[in-house]
Amino acid sequence: LIIDGGNCLIYKGQSLLTDRIYIDNKHLSDKEINRRLIETLKLERVIILPSVPNDFTGHIDGLARWLDEKTILLSNPENEKEYYKSKLYSGLKKQQLNYVFIENKTNLNSDYISAKGCYTNYIELENEILFPVFNIKSDQKAMNQIQLLFPSKKLVPIYSNAIAKNGGLLHCISWQD
């Protein structure tokens, strides 16, 4: 299986990925890909959501993060086209996933390579959240949202523009599950 680290989030026997997994493994059927994921990663369930249009990585860590078994943190898709939002919400409903929105200002980028403004791409440690910031207005609102969701964890802002300009952020470079 071809699988990028940024496109696989595992939480309590469940894996969250985007449909990029199917594109990267065209030589296999969707059913076979799901079977291999379950077997290889020792999963009970594989959840596939549509990747964000024009996101050249197609990774899940630019779209969502697990909060608990039934809830994800979701980059607010307010600036995406209606067909995508419909497909995304339909997928979430089908999988019986709840979601909480977080700021998403990637639409401010002049190109679709930069991940500047993406706040789901953080690293979660036992007692800390290493959180990407970009020196833009939405940073503070996103940090406040994360602090409310993880009140027992120390929030450590990491200036991330240099990493973001190549399309990735903190979680991307860690392959943390």
Short names for language-model regions:
Residues 1-177:
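Histidine/cysteine-enriched polar flanking segments
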